Amino acid sequence: MSADRIPSFSVAELNTAIGNLLERGFAPRFLVEATVSRPQLKKGHLWLTLTDGEASISAVAWASQLRQLRYRPEDGDGVTVVGKLNFWAARASLNVQVLDIRPSLSTVLRQFELVRRRLEEAGLLDITRRRPLPRQPRTLAVLTSVPSSALADMLRTASERWPMTRLLVVPIPVQGSVAARIREVLGRLAEEASALGLDALVLARGGGSREDLAVFDDEDLCRDLAAFPVPVVTGLGHEDDLTVADLVADHRAATPTAAIVALLPDRHVALRELQQQRQRLRELRSRWLERQHQRLLDRRQALALLTPQRRLQQLRQQLEQRRALLRALSPQRWLKQGLALVSNGQGMTIDGVKGVRKKDTLTLSFHDGSIETVVTQVRPQNSSSTP
């Protein structure tokens, strides 16, 4: 091959040509799944190594970009990096410029399990420490991003269900390394909870990936939630998502809207219940009035029995009853039926032959008069012949 057909470069030219070739021939943006190694902050820039166990490459997040990142990786974190290639011609050095970086799902789940275990050992996940939710709260603090579709849904649901409750909306960041900022808001609310008349706290975030919810696995944030002075309700992500914040809350709702539903009664249901209670009260009042009316009638009847006229009538009835009894038991009644009353000379009634002697004078009394007779013979009845 002739020398005039071989390209000739200086070192600088060669490196520049290689850089141009790489930058033109490679994707302007790409995703890298990797593990972070040796992250270091130098002059405001974050330097780190991305590795997968078989190969590694240097990466950098410039200070201007670093301020916009919502997540700061630590050594050993699994991450997904959005980046582009950077080639420094002076040293023929190649690295990845970080445009965005997020924790991988494995990192998020590992952190979740670590924090969950610590708080469980501290007793903060014990269901017996959960507080009951207020039945008709007057004031709720709602911590969520503003504006957001989740907030719009919550406000609409609250207005439809129980418009009497005041919602104190407190804007917070809900993604990235923002746990410290959320804790700051929680701290101020905890101090003012009594003055604000808070009945409960709602911590809400709309849908997203499980990695987006990683901030709600922060241990210090979850401890603050557990210590908050009023009941806490979480509505984070989707129904299948579970964070440590959900575990320490007094009630975990599947969505932000469900959190409002859990706290606010349905006014239509409440109205029906009120109408039913009114009907029960009317029925109770009617039955009570009926009982009182019957009791009054009974007492009036009892009083009527105590009047002199009524008492005299009762006495007359009793007297007549006794007269009838006396008439039924009177000897005259028996004498009229053909019987006679026998008495001796001393006027004593004779009820048998015992004690009667021959020549005794006896008096036989009939219903229309009496007869005196002299006993001529006494014939006692033979007891053995008595049938």
UniProtKB/Swiss-Prot annotation:
Gene name of the record: xseA
GO CC terms in record: cytoplasm; exodeoxyribonuclease VII complex
Keyword Hydrolase: yes
Enzyme class label: hydrolase
Single GO MF descriptor: nucleic acid binding
HAMAP family in alphabetical order: Exonuc_7_L
Pfam family for this entry, one: tRNA_anti_2
Enzyme Commission number(s) from the entry: 3.1.11.6
Functional description taken from the UniProt entry: Bidirectionally degrades single-stranded DNA into large acid-insoluble oligonucleotides, which are then degraded further into small acid-soluble oligonucleotides.
GO biological process: DNA catabolic process
Species assigned in the record: Parasynechococcus marenigrum (strain WH8102)
Signal peptide as annotated in the record: none
Cross-referenced InterPro entries: Exonuc_VII_L, Exonuc_VII_lsu_C, OB-fold_nuc-bd_dom
Family: Belongs to the XseA family.
Protein name: Exodeoxyribonuclease 7 large subunit
Record localization: Cytoplasm
Keyword NADP part of the UniProt annotation: no
